[in-house]
Amino acid sequence: MAIDFSQYQTPGVYTEAVGAPQLGIRSSVPTAVAIFGTAVGYQTYRESIRINPDTGETITTQILALVGEPTGGSFKLSLAGEPTGNIPFNATQGQVQSALRALPNVEDDEVTVLGDPGGPWTVTFTKAVAALTKDVTGLTGGDNPDLNIASEQTGVPAMNRALAKKGIKTDTIRVVNPNSGQVYVLGTDYVVTRVNAGEDGEANTRDDLYTIQRVVDGGHIDPGDIVQLSYRYTDPNYHEVIRFTDPDDIQDFYGPAFDEAGNVQSEITLCAQLAITNGASTILACAVDPEGDTVTMGDYQNALNKFRDEDEIAIIVAGTGAQPIQALVQQHVSAQSNNKYERRAILGMDGSVTPVPSATRIANAQSIKDQRVALISPSSFVYYAPELNREVVLGGQFMAAAVAGKSVSAIAAMPLTRKVIRGFSGPAEVQRDGEKSRESSEGLMVIEKTPRNLVHVRHGVTTDPTSLHTREWNIIGQQDVMVYRIRDYLDADGLIGMPIYDTTIVQVKASAEAALVWLVDNNIIRGYRNLKARQIERQPDVIEVRYEWRPAYPLNYIVVRYSIAPETGDITSTIEGTTSF
């Protein structure tokens, strides 16, 4: 698609491969592997909070009732270790009240008593106090006389500080006493309260903030106590594009790759681990965000769309091996590459349960037929999972992640052919040599196990085997690096926005040549020729740079030709057991 400068274009440096899409300036060469797929969906967090003093007036009510029908004597009450004097078994409410008000830890206006002589007595404290204790050794008569005490508190518990994380799954909150290990009970000891609805003002979304409040009546958490909480939460940015350089950070964020049964629960974690194992230094990840329990292709597409205009991406990898994702990724790669964000994709088919037949794999490659997209074959591979301490069968999408890591770890001119892929024991499907050759010729990047037990790429091809230039993975890679570098050089020289003088064309040509020389010196391309720069007469604000470039072609074949030399002279023996002629 030719650049149409008769239509308005944003001022900048534009590049155009003859017969290919228009490409615009962005930034330096991208090297990140972008992965989208499923994740655990939450993170786990632990924190401690101190329970604030209750707010408002707290009322403590205690009911005292004599049992066993005592006929004489007295009893004592104690509050926080401070005992009263003797209280007659048939005391009036005034006698009980006077005894309690005489305690050093109670003010006169903090306690009142109601009841008949001999009880029961209702004791009301206007503050939070512990239950009264008793001494009934002074009671006489009756049948084992005793004093029953029932206590309850009513009041308003304070609002504690908000918990540290947003998007808490409230049903996963666990509250314990850090000293005794006692697990507090929801509803009995505490309640969960929403502090606010977050920036969106909508309740029950991922930016909500929560806290806990103690239950005053009957609960086991007191003001001033320090309690420890653990919970699961989904950060509001959990399903956005996030940059990683450390595999441990990826696992901490998206969860372990496998569940206890050995099923893949975090496609992102496993893909990222394999990409980094094979040389990737930067991962851009985006977790799918399903609305229900089942992940749909629309969920994958939503995650893929979030990679738009991300300038670090070199290769896209899908965490799913479902066939419908292939067309979605191809459309994404094509649209972004036509809009100054050049990128490629390596995909795989999921044959972990039922292998995808070779004919189907070939048909999938033919339906894609894009020099920017590679499709891995076969569809299943054996992988040793150290966390499970056993081998599992994975789909081809995980091999695609490993190959993507290998690709970005080398210079653009380096072919993928015969490159060793680490992390796998080998294909889980048996293929004959003829079948593998046919697949390679039809646009499948075949992974095989060599007689030396190495797992490598048989031939680094794209899904477009039309010609050498569209077939070889490293040629389109060289082109991407080349246009990025030329745009960088031209833009860095500050030419855009300057007036065009007689020397401007020379400056533009010199800047482009400096970029091309750098590419040659760094073994990105082999060479270039016929570099020209001209001002277009019909569009005088456009300077066009043209040249031809030569890629570093992959060495795919070595031909050794030989023939039998006829005997032309006498045969003589030179060393015992050998002859010469």
Curated annotation (Swiss-Prot):
GO terms for biological process: symbiont genome ejection through host cell envelope, contractile tail mechanism. GO terms for cellular component: host cell cytoplasm; virus tail, sheath. Keywords: Host cytoplasm, Viral contractile tail ejection system, Viral genome ejection through host cell envelope, Viral penetration into host cytoplasm, Viral tail protein, Viral tail sheath protein, Virion, Virus entry into host cell. Signal peptide: none annotated. It comes from the Viruses. It is found in: Virion; Host cytoplasm. Disulfide bonds: none annotated. Polymerizes as an extended structure around the baseplate-tail tube complex. During ejection, the sheath shifts to a contracted form, thereby making the inner tail tube protrude through the host cell envelope. This is Tail sheath protein. It comes from Mycobacterium phage Bxz1 (Mycobacteriophage Bxz1).
